[in-house]
Amino acid sequence: MVKVILNGCSGKMGSVVSNLAETKFPNVEIVAGIDNNTMAQRSYPIFAKPEDCNVSYDVLLDFSRADALKSLVEFSKKTKKPLILCSTGYTAEDLKFIEESSKEIPLFRSANMSIGINLVNNLLKKVAPVLYENFDIELVERHHNQKVDAPSGTALLLAHTIQDSLNEETKLLYGREGIAKREKNEICVNTVRGGGIIGDHEVIFAGDGEVIEINHKAISRDVFAIGALKACEYMADKTKAGKYSMDDVLQLNF
């Protein structure tokens, strides 16, 4: 049995993860939660801060916000247990901190836990270099009106994957305004916030005679929870410090 502490257990994703762990993952048990809202109805105890939690566990799973990062890393260092980061909105300083922390603990991070997005991300590594010379590349990401970070972590993941796959230097733009002709080396990420959109990501390769679109639409938050719980199963026995991702969980390499 994989014992999990869930940070952000009272939020939307925390609720989905808790429910799926009980109904779809017989080998995973949420043994404790961490959240400012300690009054949520859960089958496990909830603590306000990581340092208050004295429950034995195998993996610490985070579905909260970027500002929880340092306290979670310190807790994982103290307990010598793997940490899974599923939050977004990290700053450049945060990402550097994550990189350094992975030298001390097994640290898993993914901007998106869905199987589909990770397949798309790996597909882009192959497609983008083939199309770049004759196609303009644009991205559109759409999320609900309560999402606080923009562009989404997933959109940045896809954009950076495209950039890293190309031999030429490219420039990321975030939205367009004013009067200016598009430069060849631009990759623009456009953001939509509205309603209850769970998460749509579209990568557009626009050529003179044809347009190729790669789309992913999340129609349920279950897809993120399933990926996270699979990551818990994968990370439970990891003791070696290092960086891990959904590519490791899904064994993607194409």
From Swiss-Prot:
CDD domains for this protein: DHDPR_N (cd02274)
Which reactions are catalysed by this chain? (S)-2,3,4,5-tetrahydrodipicolinate + NAD(+) + H2O = (2S,4S)-4-hydroxy-2,3,4,5-tetrahydrodipicolinate + NADH + H(+); (S)-2,3,4,5-tetrahydrodipicolinate + NADP(+) + H2O = (2S,4S)-4-hydroxy-2,3,4,5-tetrahydrodipicolinate + NADPH + H(+)
Which cysteines in this chain are paired by disulphide bridges?
none
Q: Which PROSITE patterns match?
A: DAPB
Would the keyword DNA repair be found if you checked this record's keyword annotation?
no
Q: Which Gene3D superfamilies match?
A: Dihydrodipicolinate Reductase, domain 2, NAD(P)-binding Rossmann-like Domain
Gene Ontology BP terms: diaminopimelate biosynthetic process; lysine biosynthetic process via diaminopimelate
Q: Which Pfam families match?
A: DapB_C, DapB_N
UniProt lists the family membership as follows: Belongs to the DapB family.
Q: What protein is this chain from?
A: 4-hydroxy-tetrahydrodipicolinate reductase
What species was this sequence derived from? Clostridium perfringens (strain SM101 / Type A)
Q: Mind giving the lineage of the organism this protein is from?
A: Bacteria, Bacillati, Bacillota, Clostridia, Eubacteriales
